[in-house]
Amino acid sequence: MKNNGGTRVVVIGTGFVGASYAFALMNQGIADEIVLIDANESKAIGDAMDFNHGKVFAPKPADIWHGDYDDCRDADLVVICAGANQKPGETRLDLVDKNIAIFRSIVESVMASGFQGLFLVATNPVDILTYATWKFSGLPHERVIGSGTILDTARFRFLLGEYFSVAPQNVHAYIIGEHGDTELPVWSQADIGGVPIRKLVESKGEEAQKELERIFVNVRDAAYQIIEKKGATYYGIAMGLARVTRAILHNENAILTVSAYLDGPYGERDVYIGVPAVINRNGIREVIEIELNDDEKNRFHHSAATLKSVLARFFTR
């Protein structure tokens, strides 16, 4: 049972991403209870000890401990960060065979506890594994969320802000689609201070247009670059997961680019994919269908088709 009647988050998988996410939760005071579960129990025990030793410095100290699947029964949110890691040269979709089996075991164990909360999935390929979590759990699709393109969108806003010398918080631009090689930028709706980004570069000539495309390529390929340099990405996605968690637990109705189930929006059905969605205490309140130009529509449908072709190997649809 919950110790204080507050919010409980269970983190499954305390590798680089899971531990960084728990650290972000502690530092931002987002949850009242944080439970760490890992196949390597010793790692989870050590992480819990380490976090507790720093609790005195936290803005809102949480109760944090290593636990087991029974702790999911009273959880508001279960965040899955477990699974095989992406190696140099691997695409996110290369991981699917390894991680589907892992996820079946995890999700069935969570549901056996009597869990009635929300799932947030971070493991790659995140769109595929979010769909798998929905299927394995039997929960309504609005209560199963993937991290989607939240980090890609953050990278996009950062690089555009750097290029235009403005704070990334004031850049309004989205990356949608698969969290992976077929994702796309929505240039037609991107703006800074209400001024379309395409208009901002009109007077700067062809080289400025090429620079925008280079910015997107750097966003799309950022994970490959980071993995090559340091072996894994974890700080950025951990902060993105913390942002989604805050939107859920604080009932914010925040619009974030997560992996959401589509059943009509954007002309797609039966697929989880990165799109802007309203996030609150109940999960995904609604998908925001932004207007796309013809090229963006075609690229989005291609991205969805790529995901569906992978899903067809594992699920009858």
Curated annotation (Swiss-Prot):
Gene3D superfamilies (UniProt xref): Lactate dehydrogenase/glycoside hydrolase, family 4, C-terminal (3.90.110.10), NAD(P)-binding Rossmann-like Domain (3.40.50.720)
Binding site for substrate: 86, 92, 124-127, 152-155, 233
Enzyme type, top EC level: oxidoreductase
Keyword entries, A-Z: Allosteric enzyme, Cytoplasm, NAD, Oxidoreductase, Phosphoprotein
BP-aspect Gene Ontology terms: glycolytic process; lactate metabolic process
CDD domains for the chain: HicDH_like
Residues the record marks as active site: 179 (proton acceptor)
Binding site for beta-D-fructose 1,6-bisphosphate: 157, 172
Any matching Pfam family: Ldh_1_N
Regulation: Allosterically activated by fructose 1,6-bisphosphate (FBP).
UniProt modified residues of type Phosphotyrosine: 224
InterPro entries reported for this sequence: L-lactate/malate_DH, L-lactate_DH, L-lactate_DH_AS, Lactate/malate_DH_C, Lactate/malate_DH_N, Lactate_DH/Glyco_Ohase_4_C, NAD(P)-bd_dom_sf
Record-level GO cellular component terms: cytoplasm
Molecular-function GO terms, alphabetical: L-lactate dehydrogenase activity
Pathway membership: Fermentation; pyruvate fermentation to lactate; (S)-lactate from pyruvate: step 1/1
Compartmental location: Cytoplasm
HAMAP family: Lactate_dehydrog
UniProt family annotation: Belongs to the LDH/MDH superfamily. LDH family.
PANTHER family from the UniProt entry: L-2-HYDROXYCARBOXYLATE DEHYDROGENASE (NAD(P)(+)), L-LACTATE DEHYDROGENASE
Quaternary context: Homotetramer.
Annotated protein name in UniProt: L-lactate dehydrogenase
Provenance organism: Bacillus caldolyticus
